[in-house]
């Protein structure tokens, strides 16, 4: 039996808490990628990557959930019957890439949200269903015709912009290399922003107490 996590899913938490330090959100990003790397190392594709399927524990760590559509040992040209909400969906133009593409692209959206506090090509975290499909169409257009996916703020782009772009362009075959690069980028950002990080430590300590 799984424990009841009173803090709920990460999407709802982000909407209801607007003062979460960036270092805290980055810590959650690393933990999410660690979870996905654990799945990929065991030939499991999550298939349904989005922030409502990330739960916040009582001590403010994150865990992945909802593996009802997960696939074990998928053949290379596997056709997925379902997936995450439209704004997280991997564009059809990437069909023929590794089946892990659905996780990698969705993870790119998750990372973008945690770093930007908004969804790609939208002003906040609460797009309408119509807007989600507009963004999906834009992602599909970029995949087929070229162009630029949405980008991070100037302060974070030098550290994490390439990682997010590689997710959107399916340059990772699995989450293990992504995890290594994200941890290295986080370490570099941490060294350059020590004062911000001290505030994040206080934030998490206060929440856990």
Regions found by a protein language model. Give the residues of each.
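Catalytic-loop of the protein kinase fold
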Residues: 39-57
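Activation segment/activation loop of eukaryotic-type protein kinase catalytic domains
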Residues: 52-95
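Conserved C-lobe activation region of Hanks-type protein kinase-like domains
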Residues: 91-155
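Conserved C-terminal C-lobe helix
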Residues: 155-167
């Amino acid at each position: 039996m799984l424990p009841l996590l009173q803090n709920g899913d990460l999407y709802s938490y982000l909407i209801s808490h607007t003062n979460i330090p960036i270092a805290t959100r980055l810590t959650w990003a690393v933990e999410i990628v660690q979870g996905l790397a654990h799945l990929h190392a065991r030939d499991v594709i999550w298939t349904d990557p989005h922030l409502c399927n990330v739960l916040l524990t009582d001590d403010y760590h994150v865990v992945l959930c909802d593996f009802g559509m997960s696939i074990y040992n998928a053949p290379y040209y596997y056709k997925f019957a379902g997936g995450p909400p439209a704004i997280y969906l991997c564009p059809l133009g990437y069909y023929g890439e590794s089946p892990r593409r659905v996780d990698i692209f969705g993870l790119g959206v998750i990372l973008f949200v945690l770093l930007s506090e908004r969804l790609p090509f939208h002003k906040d975290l609460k797009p309408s269903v119509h807007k989600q499909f507009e963004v999906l169409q834009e992602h599909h257009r970029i995949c087929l015709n070229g162009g630029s996916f949405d980008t991070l703020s100037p302060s974070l782009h030098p550290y994490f912009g390439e990682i997010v772009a590689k997710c959107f362009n399916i340059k990772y075959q699995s989450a293990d290399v992504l995890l290594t690069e994200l941890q290295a980028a986080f370490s570099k950002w941490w060294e350059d922003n020590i004062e911000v990080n001290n505030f994040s430590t206080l934030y998490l300590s206060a929440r856990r107490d």
